A protein has these predicted regions:
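Iron-sulfur cluster-binding cysteine motifs and their immediate structural context
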Residues: 1, 6-25, 227
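Entry/capping segment at the start of metal-dependent catalytic domains
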Residues: 14-52
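Portal/gating segments that form or line small-molecule/metal binding sites
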Residues: 46, 51-60, 64-113
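Gly/Ser/Thr-rich loops at beta-strand to alpha-helix junctions
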Residues: 48-51, 75, 120-130, 158-160
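Long, compositionally biased charged/polar accessory segments in the mid-to-C-terminal portions
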Residues: 63-66, 169, 173-285
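Cofactor-cradling patches in redox/metallo enzymes
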Residues: 107-113, 128-135
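A short alpha->loop->secondary-structure connector
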Residues: 135-153
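Short, conserved secondary-structure transition motifs
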Residues: 153-166
Length: 285
């Protein structure tokens, strides 16, 4: 029931007054440093260097957070869903990229009733909403934002609806349970099967399954996060990690000092800017 608190207007990333910090020619957004990062631990079926899973594992094991709000996956149906994880074992089950997108913020109101500090992982649209919660002076918004200790953003050009999976299985003539993981790059969706086989689909052929909301998003690198992570511009086998805030740097240093991650320089920043600019221009900003 609406109580006319106006919190929704205060934090909506599609309101013109709220878009200035999101839409700009500065593709990377504000940041302190950029690194190539690889997990030093076996953290499950991670994507690229496994940086997100490793950072969250460090936060959980060092008791910096009570839980993490991430995207889980029904591996039989290949459908994603929001999941709250309280330990590293459950976290590892959620490792890896999901190309179908669902409302990761859906459980947050219930979660914050029982814990003090959470980490949240999301694509730029999710990060925009939580980032604006943090900036808001609205009482209701502040109650939620205060509980988000770490906000981790994922590079995202676009996401797909759940209807993508039936289309992929139809095109490849395989049931959904045979799919191990999917990855997108170079205008191609690569599907890795459980038996090690690989199949590909040109991305333009499945563009009709892109979520409509993605066309209203200008942010590729999740500018309002504490830490942004992605594969574009990285050294092979590693993730790009953009550290934006002192909180993000603190988490990174703890993870590095405790042996969860290793890092090195050499990120191809221009490659990130190229893809970010393409998204900005494609979506009409």
């Amino acid at each position: 029931m609406c109580v006319e608190c106006k919190a929704c207007l205060d934090v909506c990333p599609r309101m013109p007054a709220n878009t200035k910090s999101i839409i700009s020619s500065d593709i990377l957004g504000p940041y302190l440093t950029v690194k190539n990062v690889r997990s030093k631990k076996n953290c499950g079926r991670f994507q690229n260097g496994g940086a997100v899973t490793a950072l969250l594992a460090a936060a959980l094991e060092e008791e910096l957070i009570d839980c993490a709000l991430v995207m889980g996956e029904d591996r039989w149906a290949q459908k994603s869903y929001p999941r709250v994880v309280y330990d590293v074992s459950d976290l590892e089950k959620c490792a890896g990229s999901k190309y179908t997108s669902n409302a990761v913020l859906e459980p947050i109101q219930d979660v914050v009733k029982n814990v003090n500090n959470i980490a949240l992982v999301g694509t730029p649209c999710t990060v925009q909403a939580v980032g604006l919660l943090r900036k808001s002076s609205n009482e209701f918004a502040m109650k939620l934002a205060h509980k988000v200790r770490f906000l981790l953003g994922l590079f995202c050009f676009e996401a797909f609806s759940d209807q993508l999976i039936p289309e992929v299985t139809r095109r490849l003539c395989v049931p959904s349970w045979r799919i191990d993981k999917m990855s997108a790059g170079d205008a191609t969706m690569t599907v890795t099967l459980r038996d090690g086989g690989m199949k590909t689909i040109p991305l333009p052929e499945i563009s009709g399954y892109v979520k409509p909301g993605c066309k209203a998003c200008a942010d590729f690198t999740a500018k309002l996060s504490d830490v942004s992570v992605g594969g574009v511009g990285s050294t092979p086998g590693m993730s790009v990690v953009i550290l934006r805030t002192p909180e993000g740097v603190g988490l990174f240093k703890i993870a590095e000092e405790r042996g969860f991650i290793e890092a090195k320089d050499g990120v191809k920043v221009k490659a990130i800017e190229k893809v970010g600019k393409l998204k900005l221009e494609r979506n009409g900003f």
